[in-house]
Amino acid sequence: MFLGTHTPRLDDKGRLILPARFRDQLLDGLVITRGQERCLYIFPMQEFQRMHEEMRQAPLTNKEARDYQRVFLSGASSELPDKQGRVTVPPLLRTYAGLERDVAVIGAGARVELWDLRTWESYLDEVEPAFADRREEVLPGVL
């Protein structure tokens, strides 16, 4: 499980040093792809393969499923961390997420999210106050 927030920097080649806590789970390979809210999702290869199998179950006649798969998979890039725990974030994905140098790497359970640091901070400023004001459970039985 991926937990916590880390604030590394991308180097001049667009490489990210994975947080040490995440490396063991990503050592055998990972997939970086477009996420929602203009972040990137990073999945361990096995988790991505499981998700892909679920996506394949959607009927080809379902336009929303086709659209989602196109957007999600067309930006996907499989990567293998080097000995220093670095992975290259492809230029297409860096542009999509507005990544320059300062980034936030957040644990989101079964996935890691990669955000531009300022965008992440703005997102938290907007969403976090409402977190405590919820009258109903967002995740029934959990919170």
Curated annotation (Swiss-Prot):
One of its GO terms (biological process) is negative regulation of DNA-templated transcription initiation. It is found in: Cytoplasm, Nucleoid. Residues 5-47, 76-119 form the SpoVT-AbrB domain. Keywords: Cytoplasm, DNA-binding, Repeat, Transcription, Transcription regulation. The keyword DNA-binding applies. One of its GO terms (molecular function) is DNA-binding transcription factor activity. This is Transcriptional regulator MraZ. Pfam families: MraZ. Forms oligomers. GO terms for cellular component: cytoplasm; nucleoid. The keyword Hydrolase does not apply. SUPFAM superfamilies: AbrB/MazE/MraZ-like. It comes from the Bacteria. InterPro entries: MraZ, MraZ_C, MraZ_dom, MraZ_N, MraZ_sf, SpoVT-AbrB_dom, SpoVT-AbrB_sf. Belongs to the MraZ family.
